[in-house]
Amino acid sequence: MYYKFSGFTQKLAGAWASDAYSPQGLRPVVSTEAPPIIFATPTKLSSGPTAYDYAGKNTVPELQKFFQKSDGVPIHLKRGLPDQMLYRTTMALTVGGTIYCLIALYMASQPRNK
């Protein structure tokens, strides 16, 4: 005997094998026909600009030459003032955050006076 959960009575009820194996009215789809082809006619490709045309100029070779020059300047400071400001800001925030964490750990380790 096969059982199926009845949504109406909220109990198990006797059912046929096909109902028990396909719950809630879901039936396996048996289709003998293939779905219609969406693009049955050949599509015409556009003769517009290719991906390379609107991607812009390839600047990688110039940047490689610029960053590989041996002029004694570290790689993270090669572009001048903006790189220096970014580096100094990052280092200041890192040192400040480290000091803040150490102070917070020190304060958390001390017992409170009552």
Curated annotation (Swiss-Prot):
Pfam families: COX7a (PF02238). Residues 1-55 form a transit peptide. Keywords: Acetylation, Membrane, Mitochondrion, Mitochondrion inner membrane, Transit peptide, Transmembrane, Transmembrane helix. It comes from the Eukaryota. It is found in: Mitochondrion inner membrane. The keyword Membrane applies. InterPro entries: COX7a (IPR039297), Cyt_c_oxidase_su7a-rel_mt (IPR017267), Cyt_c_oxidase_su7a_sf (IPR036539), Cytc_oxidase_su7a_met (IPR003177). It is a single-pass membrane protein. Assembly factor that mediates the formation of some mitochondrial respiratory supercomplexes (respirasomes), thereby promoting oxidative phosphorylation and energy metabolism. Acts as a molecular adapter that associates with both mitochondrial respiratory complexes III (CIII) and IV (CIV), promoting their association. Mediates the formation of various mitochondrial respiratory supercomplexes, such as MCIII(2)IV(2), composed of two CIII and two CIV, and the CS-respirasome (MCI(1)III(2)IV(2)), composed of one CI, two CIII and two CIV. Interacts with the mitochondrial respiratory complexes III (CIII) and IV (CIV), promoting their association. Belongs to the cytochrome c oxidase VIIa family. This is Cytochrome c oxidase subunit 7A2-like, mitochondrial.
